[in-house]
Every structure is written in structure tokens, then in C-alpha cells.
Amino acid sequence: VIWKDDNKIFYKYFNPSSKERSLNIANPDGTDWEKVVDISFKDINIAPVPQSGLVSFWNTPDAFQETVFQSVSIVGKSAKTLFTGKFGADYLWNWDGTKSLVSHTDARGGSGIDLGVINDQGGEYKNLEIPTLVSKCVWSKDNKTVYFALSGSLPDNILMPNDYDAKKFTTTDTFWKMDVTTGKKDRVIELEKMQGSYDATNLFLSPDEGSLFFINRIDDKLYKVTM
């Protein structure tokens, strides 16, 4: 279940009688529900497309399964496929819905991760040459700058993103930002100023974008980086 706005939710529904799965919209208490579209995958991620009447969805990332990134109008029409061909993919829209980050395995059943960017139609894929997950990223409101946590060396013979999502290991991250239009990267905080180890996820920025917040999976505490 995710929020569409202040007064509606999107949710996946499984009908045990018909065995059909669907994406639906309703009031927060479940009333006034409507089916948006039928879906074929058992587990999906859902994200509204900002500043549009669309909602996007995709099968939950799995290194052995090709991810199908789709969108559909909330008034309920046929779903449109935006992007396919990547395994274990996950997505993160920017603030105006013109771009989405996509993290995916470097191969089917792979142990590496690539981060790329696509436009709102799923085209113009660009590999950003950053080995990180979208769960370690956050967009600036300028819609072109991405703040991200970059992991150090990963264990051998892991399956990504499956093993990370299953919390079979933790990472040791450093913090960066990148202009996705130019490819320019800069550290957010220098190494000598970092104390402790951080496996950062659920990143978000302060309203003035002067601070970066994240949850450290090592101790489940909230941290702040002042920029």
C-alpha cells in the first residue's frame, strides 16, 4: 500500500476465489475502491509518477527475474510498459516525474549492481557507472542531482539485490552526489570526517537540502549528514 496523495491509497489485491491480482485505488479506510489494472506478478512495488495522473509498478526485484516497469492511468486503462531487459531492477522517480533512476544486476543472477537513469517514457537509458541501489539514493528538487551512498567492497559470491534485501550482509558506505546530466560526482562528506560504519538506506533531504538523513541498517538508527 502507498499513498497517492493526501486522501487516496494504491494497493495490490489478490482475489482468492478467482486467483486474480489487481492494482486498486481507494480511500484510506478502504471505501470507494476501484480497480486500476490487472497485474500478473505476485509481488510488486508501486510508485505514483509525480505531477501526473499515472501510477507506476514493477515486479519486486529478483536477480533471476527480468523486471517489467509499467505505468497506468489512475482512471484505469491498459498498462504501458516503460522499461524491460534488466534483472533485479528497482526504480526511483525524480520530483517532476521526468526521470527515474534504475538499479539492476550486472547480469542475470549476478553479484554486481549498476545504477542508470531513464526518461519518463522509459527511453534514453544511461548507465551512471555507480554500483549502488536506488534504496541508497535520493533526488534533489532540482531534478538532476542525486545524493547517494556508495558501498565499499562487497562479499564474494553474493546474489544482488536478493542477499542485501534479505539482510545477509551489511555495507560500509561513503556519501556522494552526482549531476546525472553531466556525470560530475562530488563527495558529500570527506573520509576523514566520517566516524563509524554506515549501511545507509531510506535517504531523504531536509527542506533546504542542507542535510542528508538516512537509516543505518547496522544499528537501525537515524543519522544526519550536514552538507
Give the positions of each predicted feature.
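Short glycine/acidic-enriched loop and turn motifs that connect beta-strands
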Residues: 15-19, 60-64, 105-109, 153-156, ...
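Short loop/turn segments immediately following beta-strands, especially the blade-tip
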Residues: 226-227
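C-terminal structured domain segments
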Residues: 161-166, 173-208
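Short, conserved, GDST-rich strand-edge loop motifs in beta-rich repeat architectures
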Residues: 149-170
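Blade-edge beta-strand/turn elements of extracellular beta-propeller
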Residues: 31-36, 75-83, 118-130, 183-190
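Beta-propeller blade signature
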Residues: 24-29, 70-74, 115-121, 166-182
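Conserved beta-propeller blade repeats
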Residues: 1-12, 33-58, 79-103, 128-147, ...
